[in-house]
Amino acid sequence: MIRELKNMKIWKNTSTLDGYDEGLPFTSIKEEADIVLLGSKPIGLEGFSNLKGIFRVGISRDNVPIEEAETMGIIVRFPSQETIDIVYEETACFTCSLIFRMLYSEIGTLDPWWKGIRVQLNDKVLLVIGTGNIGSRVAKKMQDFLKVETYDLLQNTATELKSLIASAD
């Protein structure tokens, strides 16, 4: 089994694992690929005549041809729910940190200390770009604290983004 795995060739469309993939047998020729490491860009399965498995590097599923792959007997695997939850929690924490910086950006040192203008969180607008697995969860969590606007390529037009950015804090 190990010998068979060592002989498998990997095709990828992501740089996520660059630096961690030394010694792995990569190919840029689809016909030679046994395994695909799939990033955020969608792929079609035409040309992958030897493919045995697709492994999604990120957490989204919208760019994976699941039904087509399974019909062809190709194994499809995604990161664990634990990994998805960790990414969500980290994204929500980063968002809270940015909100804190936005509210208290005027405060520098304590010497001389002055009482800054109080800013209400519910008056602020957060723009969440991308409402997939993580973005939708962050938007839902943050709407309890402030106004949330969302933008997603699958739901909005490109022209809407500029005005949404302008209205966001």
Where are these regions (language model features)?
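A short, aliphatic-rich alpha-helical micro-motif
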Residues: 29-31, 48, 164-167
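Rossmann-like dinucleotide/phosphate-binding beta-alpha-beta segment
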Residues: 1, 116-169
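Short helix/loop segment immediately N-terminal to the Walker
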Residues: 108-118
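N-terminal glycine-/charge-rich "phosphate-binding" loop or analogous flexible N-terminal tail
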Residues: 1-38, 138, 143-151, 156-158
